[in-house]
From Swiss-Prot:
PTM (free text): N-glycosylated.
Protein name in the entry: Leucyl-cystinyl aminopeptidase
Localization in the cell: Cell membrane; Endomembrane system
Subunit field text: Homodimer. Binds tankyrases 1 and 2.
Active-site residues, record numbering mapped to chain: E465 (proton acceptor)
Taxonomic placement: Eukaryota, Metazoa, Chordata, Craniata, Vertebrata
GO MF terms, alphabetically ordered: aminopeptidase activity; metalloaminopeptidase activity; peptide binding; zinc ion binding
EC number, UniProt record: 3.4.11.3
Reaction catalysis annotation: Release of an N-terminal amino acid, Cys-|-Xaa-, in which the half-cystine residue is involved in a disulfide loop, notably in oxytocin or vasopressin. Hydrolysis rates on a range of aminoacyl arylamides exceed that for the cystinyl derivative, however
Gene Ontology CC terms: cell surface; cytoplasm; cytoplasmic vesicle membrane; extracellular space; insulin-responsive compartment; membrane; neuronal cell body; perinuclear region of cytoplasm
Record's bilayer topology term: Single-pass type II membrane protein
Amino acid sequence: METFTNDRLQLPRNMIENSMFEEEPDVVDLAKEPCLHPLEPDEVEYEPRGSRLLVRGLGEHEMDEDEEDYESSAKLLGMSFMNRSSGLRNSATGYRQSPDGTCSVPSARTLVICVFVIVVAVSVIMVIYLLPRCTFTKEGCHKTNQSAELIQPIATNGKVFPWAQIRLPTAIIPQRYELSLHPNLTSMTFRGSVTISLQALQDTRDIILHSTGHNISSVTFMSAVSSQEKQVEILEYPYHEQIAVVAPESLLTGHNYTLKIEYSANISNSYYGFYGITYTDKSNEKKNFAATQFEPLAARSAFPCFDEPAFKATFIIKITRDEHHTALSNMPKKSSVPTEEGLIQDEFSESVKMSTYLVAFIVGEMRNLSQDVNGTLVSVYAVPEKIDQVYHALDTTVKLLEFYQNYFEIQYPLKKLDLVAIPDFEAGAMENWGLLTFREETLLYDNATSSVADRKLVTKIIAHELAHQWFGNLVTMQWWNDLWLNEGFATFMEYFSVEKIFKELNSYEDFLDARFKTMRKDSLNSSHPISSSVQSSEQIEEMFDSLSYFKGASLLLMLKSYLSEDVFQHAIILYLHNHSYAAIQSDDLWDSFNEVTGKTLDVKKMMKTWTLQKGFPLVTVQRKGTELLLQQERFFPSMQPEIQDSDTSHLWHIPISYVTDGRNYSEYRSVSLLDKKSDVINLTEQVQWVKVNTNMTGYYIVHYAHDGWAALINQLKRNPYVLSDKDRANLINNIFELAGLGKVPLQMAFDLIDYLRNETHTAPITEALFQTDLIYNLLEKLGHMDLSSRLVTRVHKLLQNQIQQQTWTDEGTPSMRELRSALLEFACAHSLENCTTMATKLFDGWMASNGTQSLPTDVMTTVFKVGARTEKGWLFLFSMYSSMGSEAEKDKILEALASSADAHKLYWLMKSSLDGDIIRTQKLSLIIRTVGRQFPGHLLAWDFVKENWNKLVHKFHLGSYTIQSIVAGSTHLFSTKTHLSEVQEFFENQSEATLQLRCVQEAFEVIELNIQWMARNLKTLTLWL
C-alpha cells in the first residue's frame, strides 16, 4: 500500500489563490489568517493548470482541453462535417506570419476566389438569418410549432442514415434475444453474438436499433418463410448510438424475422455497461471481476438491442468463463458445458418478458449463502473473504419477499433471486430482475463494525430493490419521463415495508428527514415536475434525482393517508394485475385508483396537479373564531416578486389534515380537500391552536398567520407531547424554512426550538440540528467565527441535558442510538462538554491495539474524526483503511480522513480517489461532499472539481446522480457574489449541455439564495444571538 506523506504532494497555486481570498464586504481575508487556513501560498510549488491526473480507464493518451471541447461539440451537433475537425485544426496551425512582417501582394486569381468565398458566406448567413426561428440541436433543425424537420443524419460510411430521431421507430419490435458472450477478464475484452427475433408492426425496409462501441463483424438476416440467412448492409450513426440494418426485402406487417449480429468490444472501464473491476483480496492478490449496470442507456454498449424500456422481450443468455469463476444472470442456470478451449459455457433459462435495462450478468470469484422461499431460491453473493457478512441481508430478503408477495397478491415470478455485493459499483444498488446488484456497503453487514444506521441502510435498500421486482420490472414505465412510477413507488414501499416488518427501526424518521430535504430542492425555480418530457441522454440521466425518488414517494404517502390504506392497497393491486409485463404511463396508475374510488373522487385530476407541475404549495392558516381560513400559493424560497409573479397560476388539490387542542390527538383527525386558492373550514368549537398537515403526511409547508405560531410555541413550551414527534419535527422544519424567506422573524424560529430542553425524541432534535447547522456553515464559511460560536453556544444550552445523558455504548433502541450518534457528533465537532476527551481516549486505545479493540459502532465515526485531527491519528487511520474487511468501517474512516483541516491531505484524498488505485473512484462523491462541508475544504473541493471537470464527466456520465452530487457538494455553501460569478463563469465556459444541467442551474440558485439569506438575517443574528 502506498503511504501518505505531506511532502509528496504539491498543491496547484490556483487552488491556493482562490477568489475567497479577495476582500469583499463581510468576508475575512483568509490569506491574512493563518490560523484559519493551514497553507500559505509560498509553501507550495506552482502546478500548471493544464496538468492531468490519469483516471483509470482513460489511459495516458488523453485529448487536450481544446480537442475535448471540439469533439464534444461535434457529438452535440451530430453533423458529419465535424468528423474532419482534426484535419481542419492541423491546417490552421500550419499558418505562420512571415518573419519580416511583410505581406505579399495577392494575385488576380486569389482575389477572384476571395470575392467568391465572401459572396457565398454572405449568402449562407442571409439564409440562416431568414430561416423562421430555426434552432440547430442534437436532433437537427426544429422550426417553431413544427416537428421532425430534421437535418438528415449521415452514417459513418458517408451514406444517409434512414432515421433522424433519438427515439427508435416502432415499426419493428423485438420478441426474443439469444445472447452469447465470451469475456476475457485478462485483456478486458469480449466477443459477442446476438440473435434477435423480430416482428413487423408496419411495412418497412429498415431495422433501427441501438449499438455503441461494438466492432461488428457480421450481420445476417432471415425471414420466417425462408430459412436462408442473408448478409445485409449495416449503417452506424454514433451520435444517437444507433445502427440501421437495411433488409434485403420489405418487412411485411405481422411477419416474423431474425437478425443475427456478431461483434467484439472492450469491457468498459467506467461504471456503465459491461464493465471490469480489479480488486485486491485479503492475501494481497489482484482479482478481476466483471459486472453490468445498464440503467438507463447502457445495455446498447454490451449488445446491439432495442434499448428503450417499452421494447420488452425475453432473453436467453450464454456466458463463457474460466473454470474458477462463477457466472450469474437474471435466470437460473440451465446447463454448463466444457468448451474446446478448456473453458465453461453456462446457459441460462429463457427469461420472462422484460426491458433491456434490466438484463444483467456477472463473472468473477464469488461465494453465496442461500435459502428457499416457497419455491424461489434466495441467494446472497459476495467475494469469498466477505461471505460471513451476508447473513443479515439473507434474513432481511426472505422476510421482505414474503411480505411483498402477500401485500401485492402476486407471486414473485422467477425461480431464483440473487443479491450480489459488487466490489466496485457506482450506484447504491440496481434492481435487475432476478439478479440484484449492490455496493458492498449497501448489502453487507458486519456485527462488529456496522452501526444501527448501517443496519437501516442495508435493510431499506434491499426493501427498495425488492419492491422494484413488481414496480419497474413487472410493470414498467413506457419512457423515462415517467421514471417516478418506478422509483417513487419503490421508495414508498421501501419505507412502508420496513415500518411494517422492522418497526423497531423507526424508518418513518428517515422518511420524514428525506421529505424535508426533498422539499428544499423542489422549492427551487430550477426544479422540475416529476413527470417531465425528456429526450437526450443528459436529460434522462437527470431524472435520477431526489424528486423522482422521494417526491414520488411523498405523493404516494399523501394519497394513501387521504384515501385510507385499504383503498390504496386495493388500487395498486389492481394496477399491478392489469399491467403485468406491460409498459405504462402515469394515467394508467390513476385509472386504477379511479376504478377503486368510483365516482367519489377523481384521483387522476387531483394527482396531476402534483405530478405535472414543479414545486409545492404554501398553505397559510388563520384562526378566526370557529373558522379556519385557508389560502394556497406556490412556496418560493425567495421573496423576489419577479419570480413569484411568473407562477401565480399554480393550484394544487391539497389534502388538509389538522389537529387542535379541542380534541384528543390520538382519536381526532379531520381531513378535507383544498382545491381552490382559498377556502374556509368550520370548526365545531373555538380552539387555542391548530396544527395542520398531521404527521407531515402532506407534501406542503404551513404558515400560521397572526398569532398562530405564537400559540403553537406556547403549547410546545407547556407540553410538547400533545403533538407527535413527527408534528414537532414538522413545525421546526416549517418555521425555519419560512424564516429563511422572511415570512416570520428568524428569532421566532429560535423561540420555537427553546422547548428542545424537554425533547427526548430523535426526529425533532435532528431536524433542529440540521437547520441550525445550515446557519452555522454559512456564518463559518464567511469568517464570522464569533457569531458562529455564539450560535453553537445557544444550541448547546438547549441540548446540554441530552448530551450529558449519553453513554459511549451501543445500548438502547435504534432511535435512541441514532440520537446518541447525532448528539455526540455535534458535541465533539464543537469541542463541547468532555466529548473530545472521551473520543480521544477511545481512539488512543483503538490505535494502541492496532485497530483490534472494538469500538461502539454508533459513535465510531465521531471517534475517528477526533482521532484524525492529529498527524499521527490521521496517518494511522489511513494505514488501516486498505486492510479493513468491513466496508462500513472503511466508510467511517474515509469520512474522518476527509474531515481533516489539512488542505494537503484533503487534496491528496480527492486525487487518489479520482485515480482509483488506493481509494475507489466510487467513493469520490462522498469525499468531495465531506471536504466541501469543512473549513477551508469547501474552497478546495470547488477548485478540485474545476481542475478535473473533464475527467469527472468522462468517468461519470454528464447529468448522472454522481455529477449532480459533486456539483452540489462543492458549491452549496458559497454565499458571496464573487463565488457566484466564479461558478457561473466556469460553467458558462463549458458545453451548452453542461450549462443547462439542472444541477448547474440549481447551484447558481442556491448560492444566490445563500447571499439573500445572509443579507436578510446577518444583522438580526448579530444583534440578538
